[in-house]
Design a protein with these regions (language model features):
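Short secondary-structure boundary segments
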Residues: 17, 64, 85-87, 107-108, ...
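Catalytic domains of carbohydrate-active enzymes, especially glycoside hydrolases
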Residues: 3-16, 98
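Histidine/lysine/aspartate-rich catalytic loop segments that bind and position anionic ligands
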Residues: 82, 86-114
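Catalytic cores of alpha/beta
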Residues: 4, 43-58, 72, 87-99, ...
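Conserved beta-strand positions in the central sheet of alpha/beta enzyme cores
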Residues: 12-14, 44, 61, 82, ...
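Glycine-rich phosphate-binding active-site loops on the catalytic face of alpha/beta enzymes
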Residues: 62-72, 104-116, 147-179
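N-terminal active-site wall of soluble small-molecule enzyme domains
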Residues: 12-75
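Alpha-helix-loop-beta-strand connector modules within alpha/beta enzyme cores
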Residues: 26-45, 71-88, 116-144, 178-179
Length: 180
């Protein structure tokens, strides 16, 4: 993680600890937060505004089955809140109305990180970009061979997981260096 963040190519790090106890989430979260802070990387907690508050993380990412954004704002106040919109312009409009700080769309490509029920297209990114200045995040199966098209089609940020952390061909540092 240190070497990857040291490259300066990571603006946000999302911590996903679905199968851990709260105690372990806090222990791991504190260590990750310190590393992120050292490299000016914002720490985003997946699905859990309570953990976001406990860790005083920079923000929280909410899926469609997580706590409502308005409830999350009561818990974490002015922290960053991003919303998964899958491939839906309707969900994006709701998130925009509720003042989400970013909108995440995907999966754009097959992914091993989680079971993707939805496939997003660059058409969705282009359509939503006309509706808002809210940053758009592309997620799902992104790698060194397919990322440029997403950036050309209005994605402000890329959420990349398996390509960096579970790559059979490249170590994390090698993988991230291939994303220019």
């Amino acid at each position: 993680l240190l070497l990857v963040l040291k490259t300066g190519k990571v603006s946000f790090f999302q911590l996903r600890l679905k199968k851990y106890s709260l105690k372990n989430k806090i222990l791991i979260g504190k260590k990750i937060k310190r590393i992120c802070k050292n490299y000016n990387v914002k720490l985003i907690i997946n699905d859990d505004p309570f953990l976001t508050k406990i860790l005083n993380a920079d923000g929280c990412h909410l899926g469609q089955n997580d706590i409502n954004i308005l409830e999350a704002k009561k818990i974490i106040k002015n922290k960053i809140i991003g919303i998964t919109c899958h491939n839906s312009i309707r969900l994006a409009r709701i998130a925009i109305k509720n003042k989400a700080d970013y909108l995440a769309f995907g999966a754009f490509f097959p992914t091993r990180t989680k079971n993707a029920k939805y496939t997003a297209t660059t058409k969705v990114l282009n359509t939503v970009k006309k509706l808002t200045k809210t940053p758009l995040i592309a997620i799902g199966g992104i790698n060194n061979l397919n990322y440029k098209n997403l950036l050309l089609n209005k994605a402000n940020f890329l959420a990349i997981s398996s390509y960096i952390w579970n790559n059979k061909k490249y170590k994390p540092l090698e993988a991230i260096k291939k994303i220019r």
